[in-house]
Regions:
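C-terminal motif of bacterial Sec signal peptides marking the signal peptidase cleavage site
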Residues: 16-19
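Positively charged n-region of N-terminal signal peptides that target proteins for export
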Residues: 1-4
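Short alpha-helical catalytic segment bearing the HExxH-like zincin motif
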Residues: 338-349
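Post-HExxH zinc-binding segment in Zn-dependent metallohydrolases
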Residues: 222-232, 359, 370-404, 495
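Catalytic Zn2+-binding segment of zinc metalloproteases
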Residues: 350-364
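N-terminal helix-rich structural modules
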Residues: 23-185, 480, 554
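Active-site-proximal, well-structured secondary-structure segments within enzyme catalytic domains
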Residues: 145-151, 159, 185-333, 403-412, ...
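C-terminal, non-catalytic "cap/extension" segments appended to globular domains
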Residues: 21-30, 57, 62, 107, ...
Length: 557
């Protein structure tokens, strides 16, 4: 009798499991059909929006910005569909076993969550952001009545010893701010309104959470970054200030923002007798980059054939990379001049491009993206630094051994300073945006300069009360994005360590970069090809053997 009861129980359990598996299979079939229907709608809209943005930034024409706004709104309206969001919520809580299916649902859930607001508010946000961005991109500051480009301003700040001209150039870089401040602030309020309607404290918190980042963890990382870099930066900035004050024949305490090499002090000022521009000025930096990437098995010729490489009136004055269709149409928008900065920028943007181009196209559409925004920034930064790598420069620029030796010490110093300077600048941006969305009614002009003085240790200009914060395009066009650049720096350092181990060398400086297809293969296999198949944190462990850490960034300073 006991055996009979036991057999009945086992039969019951088997039937239950079969029924459960059948239900899961039915749910998975329903989920796949739902995702297929979303793909059919979202895929062409994404492509249309990307193409419109490309044409807008290439030409500066209002008609393309309007087309971009329309396509973006149409796309946002799809994500705002409440019935579809409810389906995603149900599917997310179901026990789907297929990992690719479950991952797509997770990604779509957060994408829809961020848009669950009424269409009127959605329309306001989309149209205002596009209008402000168009104004920003077409604006050119003036020096003594003459319109100047961003490149013109940078050249003055890098090379001129005329203090009056330097100040005028710096002020020209800020002239866009009053033209966009009012609408940018209105945009902040609209973004916060949307976030609060969804149950978040503010837009910054919502942006992190819906992008699979923990606000508490991000805050912890940036506090640690501040503590780890504060004294090294203070020491090195005193050295830089001593050199700059002698160059300009003023006291160190008289240095102001226009005495540095970039309008925001993002870049290393000219504190070395070595000027790397001399090695690039008679070269073609685009061809150098093309040759380099081909040598590591990550060809970029198709990317460059579709790209927009040189500056002209009305064109977007900065740089970006875009994946138009997730099917191979990847492009970069740059404004190249043959100098070290643009060598770095072209390497950076093509770093994004080789990532996007080498994602496995057999993956479902919604997984054909980078694992995270900061993982593609990490790759871009990993390659960007090669413009200051003496071994790489010798190979790519045909320098002789003596020339390589001449720049080795200077480039090592530049790379250290670059890391420190950017870390402190990223602290300004992270803390400004965090505070901006927490309290947009505060005195933002004062907040901006308080943070610049605290983290970058630059004195604010006397008697200046201008919305200088609004001259940074990221606040409008790429909100709550800047922290990803610094997280990318941390991952780039961790990746350098992992690749050194992979190549069997004990120092990242000994990594073989040039004509090494094995390097490209490592990146394709471990990072690029998997796309967004895994969450960013799982991908990093798989690729490097450990969780994201600031350890290697600090060690490599």
């Amino acid at each position: 009798m006991k055996k009979f009861i036991l057999m009945l129980f086992m039969l019951f359990m088997v039937l239950m499991m079969m029924n459960c598996d059948s239900k899961i299979k039915q749910t998975e079939q329903m989920a796949q059909a739902f995702i297929d229907s979303l793909t059919n709608v979202i895929k062409p809209l994404n492509k249309a929006a990307n193409l419109a943005y490309w044409e807008a930034t290439a030409s500066g024409k209002d008609e393309y910005y309007e087309r971009y706004a329309g396509a973006s709104l149409e796309l946002a309206t799809v994500y705002a569909n409440s019935a579809d969001f409810e389906k995603l919520k149900t599917l997310k809580s179901s026990k789907i076993k297929d990992p690719l299916l479950a991952r797509q649902i997770e990604i779509l859930y957060y994408r829809f969550l961020a848009k669950q607001i009424d269409t009127t508010l959605l329309k306001q946000i989309t149209e205002m952001q596009t209008a402000v961005e168009a104004r920003f991109n077409k604006f050119r500051g003036k020096i003594d009545g003459r319109a100047v480009t961003g490149n013109d301003i940078k050249e003055i700040l890098v090379s001129s010893n005329d203090l009056t001209l330097r100040k005028k150039a710096w002020e020209a870089s800020k002239q866009v701010a009053p033209a966009v401040e009012k609408d940018m602030l209105a945009l902040v309020h609209l973004r916060n309104e949307a976030a609060r309607k969804l149950g978040f404290n503010n837009f910054q918190q919502m942006s992190l959470i819906t992008d699979e980042q923990d606000p508490t963890e991000v805050e912890r990382i940036f506090q640690e970054l501040d503590a780890a870099t504060r004294e090294p930066f203070r020491h090195d900035k005193a050295m830089m200030d001593s050199i700059l004050s002698k160059r300009f024949n003023i006291k160190p305490e008289e240095l102001r923002p226009w005495h540095y090499a970039d309008p925001f002090f993002q870049d290393v000022p000219a504190v070395s007798a070595v000027n790397l521009d001399q090695y690039y000025q008679n070269q073609n930096v685009v061809k150098i980059a093309e040759s380099f990437y081909a040598g590591i098995g990550l060809g970029v010729s198709p990317v460059l054939a579709n790209s927009d490489l040189y500056e002209r009136p009305g064109k977007y004055p900065h740089a970006y990379c875009t994946d138009i269709d997730r099917e191979g149409d990847v492009r970069i928008m740059v404004n190249v001049r043959n100098n070290e900065e643009w060598m770095a920028t072209v390497l950076h943007e093509l770093g994004h491009a080789v990532y996007s181009s080498n994602i496995d196209r057999q993956l479902p559409y919604f997984l054909r993206e980078e694992a995270h925004l900061f993982t593609t920034e990490a790759i871009a930064m990993f390659f960007e630094k090669l413009s200051k790598n003496p071994t790489w420069m010798r190979a790519m620029l045909n320098l002789d051994a003596e020339e390589e030796a001449d720049i080795r010490e200077a480039t090592a110093q530049m790379l250290r300073l670059q890391k420190l300077i950017f870390a402190r600048w990223s602290l300004v941006m992270y803390n400004f945006e965090k505070s901006l969305y927490e309290n947009p009614e505060q005195d933002l002009n004062k907040l901006w300069w308080d943070l610049v003085e605290q983290y970058q240790m630059i004195k604010r200009p006397e008697n200046r009360n201008q919305p200088d914060w609004a001259s940074k395009i990221h606040v409008c066009s790429y909100p709550v994005y800047y922290h990803n650049y610094q997280l990318g720096e941390l991952l780039a350092a961790q990746l350098t360590e992992a690749i050194a181990r992979y190549q069997g060398v004990n120092d990242g400086a000994k990594i073989k970069y040039v004509n090494n297809p094995d390097l490209g293969n490592y990146l394709k296999t471990n990072i690029f090809s998997v796309g967004r198949k895994y969450r960013w944190d799982e991908m990093i462990v798989r690729a490097t053997g450990e969780k994201l850490t600031a350890k290697y960034f600090v060690e490599q300073l």
